[in-house]
Amino acid sequence: MKYFVVALALVAAFACIAESKPAESEHELAEVEEENELADLEDAVWLEHLADLSDLEEARGFFGNTWKKIKGKADKIMLKKAVKIMVKKEGISKEEAQAKVDAMSKKQIRLYVLKHYGKKSSSKSFRKIVISKSF
């Protein structure tokens, strides 16, 4: 369960990076230079700093692709977990459970799996509290 939480936190972190605001491109920097007619040394330093932002765009592209790969693998894992949970919980065959899960959207599958693990962890915590208070 700890690994699942850590993986979920990593997925959220990559999502934040991928969704962040894109940096200014070199084309936009050229427009700024033309508009402001930069002659001052400080402005030239500022433009050099902004030119380095193109590296950030490449990094953001890498994290965006990595995020898509991680999300795809997480979706596959959740699909398998949802099938296993349905087989165990509802007592149906694996094929029937697979058909039910295939009919669900990715969002519904995620919610189903997270809801199951949330109930499971809260019931374990509740049992620990009840047992510790009874003695």
Curated annotation (Swiss-Prot):
The keyword Iron does not apply. GO terms for cellular component: extracellular region. It comes from the Eukaryota. InterPro entries: Latarcin_precursor. Belongs to the cationic peptide 06 (cytoinsectotoxin) family. Keywords: Antibiotic, Antimicrobial, Cytolysis, Hemolysis, Secreted, Signal, Toxin. Pfam families: Latarcin. The gene is cit 1-16. The keyword Signal applies. This is M-zodatoxin-Lt8q. Its main location: secreted.
